[in-house]
Every structure is written in structure tokens, then in C-alpha cells.
Amino acid sequence: DEAMALSTLRLAWSEGVLEREASIKSMVQLAAARGIPDHAARMIESGFEQGLLPRDETFVRLLANAWVSAKENKLAIGAFRRLSEIAKNGEPLVRVANLYLEMGQWQQAEQALEKAIDLGLDDAGSAYLLLGIVLAEQDNYKESFVALRRARSFEKTQRQAAKWLSYAEDMRKQYEWQRAYRG
């Protein structure tokens, strides 16, 4: 069973006899499956430090996802940033943006999305949509409308972007009204 397999692999790891990349990967995946993703992440980092694991796309992605599962957003952000550098694309930075949003850090999310778009994405429409939302939430309506219009130009995000454009316009009107009556 999984618990026994994990125990066996952990013992081999602690005794320093677990050196094969595939075995370490199995142990990491079992730890994550058993609900101890923080342990899995620490094993990966230890494998990196000991030179047992390559700092490649596969293992850095495993590390990032383990930190997400462990609810260690700051550590996950660092791992996803490294993954973006290794993969040479912006997909991991969209994950970074989402983690920043979970933490209520709008500006950091905006920066991550802009960099993700610059690096290139398979699903740029969703990134533009999210960027438009982030900008609207920061009362930056002019740039929000630009991003949302870009999102509307992609078939996948066309409907959502159109709805957000309407909503952002309402937000802008309310914002302008509040500014006019406060002053």
C-alpha cells in the first residue's frame, strides 16, 4: 500500500541509499498523495542541494506544486519564478499572479501578468482578462479597458471579457462619481 511504500522510501532516503532520480520522484509523489506536500517539497529541495536531482522543469514544477498544496504561497512563488526561467515562457508566472491575488497583492499580480504576457503564453487571452480585472480592482480603468479589449479579441475569453468591460465601466462611473462628490 502507499503508506508502506512511502515508509520504505523514506527509510532509504534517511539512510542515504536512495539516489536514483526515479525513486526520489516516486517518494515525492507518494508524500504529496499522502497529504504531506511540505515534506515532498523539502525532499525535492534536499535533492537539489545534494545534487541528486536536476533543477529541471520536471522537478521545479513538482516543487512549486508541492508548495502550493502545502499552502506555502511565498515559497511556491519563488519556485514558479524559477520554473518560468527554466521553461522560458510565461505560464508559471500566471500561477504566480494567481498566488499574489490569493494574498490580496494586486500590484505584484499585475507585474507577474505583464511579464508572463511578455514572455509568451499559450493562453494569452486568459492572462489579458486577469490583467484587466487586476487593473480595474486598482482603479486603473484606462489600462484595464486596454487589457480587457485584448482579452475580448481571443475566442476563449471573448464573452467573459465583454462582461468585465461592462462591469469595469460601471466601476469607473461609480469611482468618478465618488471622487466628484467627496471633493
Question: In which residue ranges do the predicted regions lie?
Answer:
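Alpha-solenoid helical repeat scaffolds
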Residues: 1-183
